[in-house]
């Protein structure tokens, strides 16, 4: 349509950032962009994960398939995954074999020779590539208990039992299998816009104000110790339950508090599995989203693009 523009200039403000956790604000955009970013982070940012397992010896109580499943779900450091090739696209091995450009080999050999149970963990996997290794959670742990730093348990062996195998990690995305998803949790919420009618609030007694505040299941409101006025303490604690609004109506004060979501402002919470740092996960997702949009813009097959993306696809090709 003439005169319609989709152009926006989103802004990002980081609130909290750790290796495995990020919280940030995404503003000046709409829910379609927020949801697209969330979905890309969960299912389309590539990582490395164990895909093939050749078991040579297994005398543990676990069958081969169970061990292979456990191995596949061990998160691997994947900073290099974006530059590696998918096995089906690898020109050096044609996807039938494996090479350094698309795969990483992990041999494992463990045998229990004492009466004490031997824990076989992710630390017993030896990587052929030092940039792709089982995630070490030691740096993220605040406890000094050494038992917390032994890695992810694969199997337990008793005297005489042995486990020997070769595992092959390949590049993939969460859309194909959850083992390749770098995200433990990705959520976003609308920022609430909370408006208090001060004139109506002044007509309430102190007891009524306390009842109003306590009607909210989360601590959104409080009383200013100096002025005695009801104030917003933590707007993001609001869960859109409308309990405080219903309470105001029950008190005969409709419109006392109005709460509306800001449809162009979102608060994201991102937790990583450890395969990627949370910050890198977000940046990689943005890069992939850009590539998808560029593919629409540069599409030669306009009919196919229009079928898939309709007016938006046509608009982007026109610039």
Curated annotation (Swiss-Prot):
InterPro entries: DNA-dir_RNA_pol_30-40kDasu_CS, DNA-dir_RNA_pol_insert, DNA-dir_RNA_pol_RpoA/D/Rpb3, RBP11-like, RNAP_Rpo3/Rpb3/RPAC1, RNApol_insert_sf, Rpo3/RPB3_RNA_Pol_subunit. PROSITE patterns: RNA_POL_D_30KD. This is DNA-directed RNA polymerases IV and V subunit 3B. One of its GO terms (biological process) is DNA-templated transcription. DNA-dependent RNA polymerase catalyzes the transcription of DNA into RNA using the four ribonucleoside triphosphates as substrates. Component of RNA polymerases IV and V which mediate short-interfering RNAs (siRNA) accumulation and subsequent RNA-directed DNA methylation-dependent (RdDM) transcriptional gene silencing (TGS) of endogenous repeated sequences, including transposable elements. GO terms for molecular function: DNA binding; DNA-directed RNA polymerase activity; protein dimerization activity. Keywords: Acetylation, DNA-directed RNA polymerase, Nucleus, Transcription. Disulfide bonds: none annotated. PANTHER family: DNA-DIRECTED RNA POLYMERASE, DNA-DIRECTED RNA POLYMERASE II SUBUNIT RPB3. It comes from Arabidopsis thaliana. It comes from the Eukaryota. Its main location: nucleus. Belongs to the archaeal Rpo3/eukaryotic RPB3 RNA polymerase subunit family. It is found in: Nucleus. Gene3D superfamilies: DNA-directed RNA polymerase, insert domain, RNA polymerase, RBP11-like subunit. Component of the RNA polymerase IV and V complexes. Interacts with NRPB11, SHH1, GRP23 and NRPD1. The modification N-acetylmethionine is found at residue 1. The keyword Transcription applies. GO terms for cellular component: RNA polymerase IV complex; RNA polymerase V complex.
């Amino acid at each position: 349509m003439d005169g319609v523009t989709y152009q926006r200039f989103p802004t990002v403000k980081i609130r909290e950032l750790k290796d495995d956790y990020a919280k940030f604000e995404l503003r000046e955009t709409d829910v379609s962009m927020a949801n697209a970013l969330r979905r890309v982070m969960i299912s389309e940012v590539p990582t490395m994960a164990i895909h093939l397992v050749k078991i040579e010896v297994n005398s543990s109580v676990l069958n081969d398939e169970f061990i292979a499943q456990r191995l596949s779900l061990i998160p691997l450091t994947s900073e290099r995954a974006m530059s590696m090739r998918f096995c089906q696209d690898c020109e050096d091995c044609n996807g039938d074999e494996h090479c350094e450009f698309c795969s990483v080999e992990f041999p494992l050999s463990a045998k229990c020779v004492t009466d004490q149970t031997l824990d076989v963990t992710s630390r017993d996997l030896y990587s052929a590539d030092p940039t792709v290794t089982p995630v070490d959670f030691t740096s993220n742990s605040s406890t000094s208990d050494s038992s917390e730093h032994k890695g992810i348990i694969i199997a337990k062996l008793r005297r005489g039992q042995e486990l020997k195998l070769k595992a092959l990690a390949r590049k993939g995305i969460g859309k194909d299998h959850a083992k390749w998803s770098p995200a433990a949790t990705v959520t976003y919420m609308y920022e609430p816009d909370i408006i208090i009618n001060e004139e109506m609030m002044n007509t309430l007694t102190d007891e009524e104000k306390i009842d109003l505040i306590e009607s909210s299941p989360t601590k959104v409101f409080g009383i200013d110790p100096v002025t005695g006025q009801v104030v917003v303490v933590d707007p993001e604690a609001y869960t859109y339950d409308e309990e405080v609004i219903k309470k105001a109506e029950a008190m005969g004060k409709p419109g006392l508090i109005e709460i509306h979501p800001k449809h162009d402002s979102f608060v994201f919470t991102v937790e990583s599995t450890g395969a990627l740092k949370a910050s890198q996960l977000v940046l990689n997702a943005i890069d992939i989203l850009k590539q998808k949009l560029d593919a629409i813009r540069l599409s030669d097959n306009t009919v196919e693009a229009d079928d898939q993306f309709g007016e938006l696809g046509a608009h982007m090709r026109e610039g």
